[in-house]
Amino acid sequence: MANQLILLKKDFFTDEQQAVTVADRYPQDVFAEHTHEFCELVMVWRGNGLHVLNERPYRITRGDLFYIRAEDKHSYTSVNDLVLQNIIYCPERLKLNVNWQAMIPGFQGAQWHPHWRLGSMGMNQARQVINQLEHESNGRDPLANEMAELLFGQLVMTLKRHRYATDDLPATSRETLLDKLITALANSLECPFALDAFCQQEQCSERVLRQQFRAQTGMTINQYLRQVRICHAQYLLQHSPLMISEISMQCGFEDSNYFSVVFTRETGMTPSQWRHLSNQSD
């Protein structure tokens, strides 16, 4: 694409030897589609927004983790108090003898799965390492770059240890109710979600959980689930031959007319218009 925005190394790294640095987004504003001359890890701490990665939309909130390659196209829209950090790195500058391909999905041709989640325990450990990494990447002493790379190695190992698929929180996990709730919502794309049953199972207060969820994500539970379902519908409309009525069922809407109303309200166009526009841009 002739007018594609490309973020350049020289605008983020202090010199050609620096391999890793941290870019804070407190908050992350709307950002047009772009690629990079470097790779990045994206950690979401709070709030919510729409992250479109290689034309696939993701409704993101606390705990979302992305592995972004240099050539990937992504953008941020519909942001609401979205707080995240980008840990950016140049693969060719890394000198540490670490099996990076085993730690970082998509690293120099490794199998790529971009979207993961971290529970509260993993987030806390990652935040501690990122704070140290940010301090070193801003340092000027002779060993700052080496220390930053060591910490980057520690970070990617920490992320590998604690990350999990968005709909697959391990049964043995000691994560918080909020983490369990977000995983349960990810497993409810096709079927109704009963918050009262979830709270009964977890022996928690429904009112308190609703308050905690809104405080951390900036959305109600129903708003988040609706947004996740609409994002899934957008993906299916673009990448599957399913009929709109079939897509509505796969996204938890038993009535395709109601699905069309909600989809239009959230995206500004009907499902048919979205599919037509997406096919034109392919």
UniProtKB/Swiss-Prot annotation:
Q: Which PANTHER family match?
A: ARAC-FAMILY TRANSCRIPTIONAL REGULATOR (PTHR43280), HTH-TYPE TRANSCRIPTIONAL ACTIVATOR RHAR (PTHR43280:SF13)
CDD domains given in the database record: cupin_RhaR_RhaS-like_N
Main localization, broad class: cytoplasm
- Quaternary structure annotation from Swiss-Prot or TrEMBL: Binds DNA as a dimer.
- Entries under SMART domains matching the protein: HTH_ARAC
Organism per entry:
Salmonella typhimurium (strain LT2 / SGSC1412 / ATCC 700720)
- Cross-referenced Gene3D superfamilies, in alphabetical order? Homeodomain-like, Jelly Rolls
Q: Does the keyword Transcription regulation apply?
A: yes
**Could you state one GO cellular component term attached to this entry?**
cytoplasm
Q: What is the documented function of this protein?
A: Activates expression of the rhaSR operon in response to L-rhamnose.
Question: What Pfam families does its record include?
Answer: AraC_binding, HTH_18
Looking at the record, the residues that make up the HTH araC/xylS-type domain are 179-277
Print the keywords alphabetically: Activator, Cytoplasm, DNA-binding, Repeat, Rhamnose metabolism, Transcription, Transcription regulation
Which one GO biological process term can you cite for this protein? positive regulation of DNA-templated transcription
Any one GO molecular function term: sequence-specific DNA binding
Which locations, inside or outside the cell, does it occupy? Answer: Cytoplasm
- DNA-binding region extent: 196-217, 244-267
Judging by the UniProt lineage, the source's domain of life is Bacteria
> What is the protein name for this chain?
HTH-type transcriptional activator RhaR
InterPro entries linked to this entry:
AraC-bd (IPR003313), Homeodomain-like_sf (IPR009057), HTH_AraC (IPR018060), HTH_AraC-typ_CS (IPR018062), RhaR_RhaS-like_N (IPR047220), RmlC-like_jellyroll (IPR014710), RmlC_Cupin_sf (IPR011051), Tscrpt_act_RhaR (IPR023699)
Q: Where is this site: Interaction with sigma-70?
A: 246
